[in-house]
Amino acid sequence: MTRLDSVERAVADIGAGKAVIVIDDEDRENEGDLIFAAEKATPELVAFMVRYTSGYLCVPLDGAVCDRLGLLPMYAVNQDKHGTAYTVTVDAKNGVGTGISASDRATTMRLLADPASVAEDFTRPGHVVPLRAKDGGVLRRPGHTEAAVDLARMAGLQPAGAICEIVSRKDEGSMAQTDELRVFADEHGLALITIADLIEWRRKHEKHIERVAEARIPTRRGEFRAIGYTSIYENVEHVALVRGEIAGPNSDGDDVLVRVHSECLTGDVFGSRRCDCGSQLDAAMAMVAREGRGVVLYMRGHEGRGIGLLHKLQTYQLQDAGDDTVDANLKLGLPADARDYGIGAQILVDLGVRSMRLLTNNPAKRVGLDGYGLHIIERVPLPVRANAENIRYLMTKRDRMGHDLTGLDDFHESVHLPGEFGGAL
């Protein structure tokens, strides 16, 4: 296993104007970025970064800073597969030459970090790429963008960093991997940490959810404890349906059966046959009830995979005209999946969950939660309830979104797919 340094050392080095290396999850980019605080940018630091990286230097910024400086998205519909929020490139208006030299880019970086800067201090386009970090940092999105802003803030500096991916010296056509990054860090006296470590540190020292209420809820699947939460950054309410003891005198929080369910008014409440959401929720509650211990976390704000109820209804119109669920979203200028699992991960941790068996057919959901320090020991498939109205939707989820759904090609209306729950479960 690769030796890593402490988050405390990385924060101290950032505060002292040094660079650090941050590695993300192996199921994500699986790359190491060189990171330093933008307000500490010097020609020497920038030259070092250019020499050992791809050279595509970016400056992650807090969202409020982006708004103050008028940094608009580079493209109206973000199609980056990791959701990196690129904005229009900039140069400092004064004090630079062409904008590309290490000295010029250091000047632009420091200006972006300066709380006194205004939009008119920059020319567009330029040679530095500002990135908009998610509010909540790595707890909301486990990316290098958020890691850079978090590290700067934790060091007591302005919420602005500088990042770029380190290139492999073994194979210059690819990015450096973990073992090579450790060697590089030791050669140059740099701290090496992971985003997972940063998430764990922030989770231990900060809290971004509030437990508000708890009540007994009898359901047709048995009795649950409904625990209500609000997310501090978004003021969105979420509910965890809990069965049995998750963590306590007789339980250690391990091996918990968990369903993280995205809100779906049409499917969960109205019983729409256009999706399988309602049947998945019912199946998850039944499976947790049968086990006698587990959590069904109902995530508000996830309607239509995060695009909202009214947009979802608009996509239904497009689907009736021939588009599939992915193309309908894209045609409206919306992402195929805009959901964020960071708050859900914090709720699970607050409930005492340490390791889980995750009820899902969506491998991406596993990746979305795994980066938050929650150990997923097994992905438990949910039964598929197909019908004539949702069969195309299910096939699209399988073929274009990577969902693990079997038996769809053999479907016809008179036959239930294997594993389908009946009402007696």
Curated annotation (Swiss-Prot):
Chain positions of site Essential for DHBP synthase activity: H127, E165
As cofactor, the record names:
Mg(2+); Mn(2+); Zn(2+)
Q: Where is the active site?
A: D337, R339
Task: Locate the residues binding Mg(2+) 2.
Answer: E29, H144
List, alphabetically, the SUPFAM superfamilies matched.
RibA-like, YrdC/RibB
Question: Where along the chain is Zn(2+) bound?
Answer: C264, C275, C277
Gene Ontology biological process terms, A to Z: riboflavin biosynthetic process
> Per its UniProt entry, which superkingdom is the organism in?
Bacteria
Q: Name one GO cellular component term.
A: cytosol
Pathway given in the UniProt record: Cofactor biosynthesis; riboflavin biosynthesis; 2-hydroxy-3-oxobutyl phosphate from D-ribulose 5-phosphate: step 1/1; Cofactor biosynthesis; riboflavin biosynthesis; 5-amino-6-(D-ribitylamino)uracil from GTP: step 1/4
Which residues does the annotated region (DHBP synthase) include? Answer: 1-204
Q: Map out region (GTP cyclohydrolase II) in residue numbers.
A: 205-425
An example of a Pfam family matching this protein is DHBP_synthase
Residues reported in the UniProt entry to bind Mg(2+) 1: E29
Q: Which residues bind D-ribulose 5-phosphate?
A: R28, E29, D33, R141, P142, G143, H144, T145, E165
Q: What does the cofactor field's note say?
A: Binds 2 divalent metal cations per subunit. Magnesium or manganese.
What this protein catalyses is:
D-ribulose 5-phosphate = (2S)-2-hydroxy-3-oxobutyl phosphate + formate + H(+); GTP + 4 H2O = 2,5-diamino-6-hydroxy-4-(5-phosphoribosylamino)-pyrimidine + formate + 2 phosphate + 3 H(+)
Instruction: Cite the InterPro entries for this sequence.
Output: DHBP_synth_RibB-like_a/b_dom, DHBP_synthase_RibB, GTP_cyclohydro_II, RibA, RibA-like_sf, Riboflavin_synth_RibBA
What UniProt keywords are attached to this protein's entry? GTP-binding, Hydrolase, Lyase, Magnesium, Manganese, Metal-binding, Multifunctional enzyme, Nucleotide-binding, Riboflavin biosynthesis, Zinc
Q: Which GO terms describe its molecular function?
A: 3,4-dihydroxy-2-butanone-4-phosphate synthase activity; GTP binding; GTP cyclohydrolase II activity; magnesium ion binding; manganese ion binding; zinc ion binding
Q: What does this protein do?
A: Catalyzes the conversion of D-ribulose 5-phosphate to formate and 3,4-dihydroxy-2-butanone 4-phosphate.
| Entry's family note | In the N-terminal section; belongs to the DHBP synthase family.
The record, for NCBIfam families, names: PRK00393.1 (NF001591), PRK09311.1 (NF006803), ribA (TIGR00505), ribB (TIGR00506)
PANTHER family attached to this UniProt entry: 3,4-DIHYDROXY-2-BUTANONE 4-PHOSPHATE SYNTHASE, GTP CYCLOHYDROLASE II-RELATED
Q: What is this protein called?
A: Riboflavin biosynthesis protein RibBA
